Regions:
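GNAT-family acyltransferases
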Residues: 1-104, 129-133, 146, 160-186
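Amphipathic alpha-helical recognition patches that constitute DNA-binding helices
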Residues: 104, 108, 121, 149
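Conserved hydrophobic beta-strand within the GNAT/NAT acetyltransferase core sheet
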Residues: 107, 138-143
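Active-site acidic-Proline motif in GNAT/NAT acetyltransferases
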Residues: 107-116, 146
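Conserved acetyl-CoA pyrophosphate-binding loop and the N-cap/start of the following alpha-helix
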Residues: 113, 117-125
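Conserved active-site alpha-helix within GNAT-family acetyltransferase domains
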Residues: 120, 145-163
Length: 186
C-alpha cells in the first residue's frame, strides 16, 4: 500500500477513501465533518464532478486496499490565523501506473482559491507522491488548450508540452525519479 497523505508548505493532500467519497456524493452535510475542513462555496471545482467521484468510488470499491491512493486526492489548505483548514482543490491519479511506470494526473482548484499558487503546490504534492511510491517513472497530464493557468501549473512542476490530445486538449509529461528512500530500501 502507498502512503495516503502528503504535505506541502500550505497544503495537506489526503487520498480519497470510500467513506469520504460516499459522504461527498450522498451525505454532503457530513463530508466536511469527516474531512475535518471547511468547504468553499463553489465545491466541486472544474471538471471534478459527480461522475468523477462515482468513478473513483467504483475503483476504490473494486480494487480494495491496492487501489488506495491511485485515484482521488483532496487538497486542504492548512489552518492559519485567518482561516480554518479548508478544502481548496482536488486532484489525483487516473489509476495505478502501467507496466512501464506511466501514470496520469488531473487537478482542479476551487475558484475562490485560484491565483494563489495552490494548484502549483497541489501538483507538486502529487509529483512527490508519485516519486514516493517508487512505481512511477513518467507522469502525464492533459489541459484544455485555453486553460493557460493549468498550463502554467504544469510548467512550474517541470511538465513539458508533448503535443495535442483528444477533445481540444494539450498533453504534458515529465519524468519522475523514485524517492531516495525507495532506492535505498529505507
Amino acid at each position: 500500500m502507498i502512503p495516503l497523505i502528503t504535505h506541502t508548505l500550505h497544503l495537506t493532500i489526503l487520498a480519497a477513501s470510500r467513506a469520504l467519497l460516499t459522504a461527498e456524493l450522498h451525505k454532503p452535510h457530513y463530508f466536511p465533518i469527516l474531512l475535518g475542513a471547511a468547504l468553499p462555496t463553489d465545491w466541486p471545482p472544474g471538471d471534478y464532478d459527480e461522475a468523477v467521484m462515482e468513478y473513483q468510488l467504483d475503483q476504490l470499491t473494486a480494487g480494495g486496499r491496492s487501489a488506495a491512493g491511485w485515484y482521488g486526492w483532496y487538497a486542504l489548505r492548512k489552518a492559519d490565523d485567518t482561516a480554518p483548514p479548508t478544502l481548496v482543490g482536488a486532484g489525483g491519479f487516473l489509476g495505478p501506473p502501467d507496466a512501464v511506470g506511466t501514470a496520469e494526473i488531473d487537478f482542479a482548484v476551487a475558484a475562490d482559491w485560484r491565483g494563489q499558487g495552490l494548484g502549483t503546490e497541489l501538483v507538486a504534492g502529487l509529483v512527490q507522491q508519485a516519486a514516493a511510491t517508487g512505481m512511477v517513472r513518467q507522469l502525464l497530464a492533459h489541459a484544455a488548450t485555453d486553460n493557460l493557468a493549468a498550463h502554467q501549473v504544469l510548467l512550474h512542476n517541470d511538465f513539458l508540452p508533448a503535443g495535442p490530445a483528444a477533445e481540444g486538449r494539450l498533453r504534458f509529461d515529465r519524468a519522475v525519479e523514485p524517492a531516495a528512500d525507495i532506492l535505498l530500501g529505507a
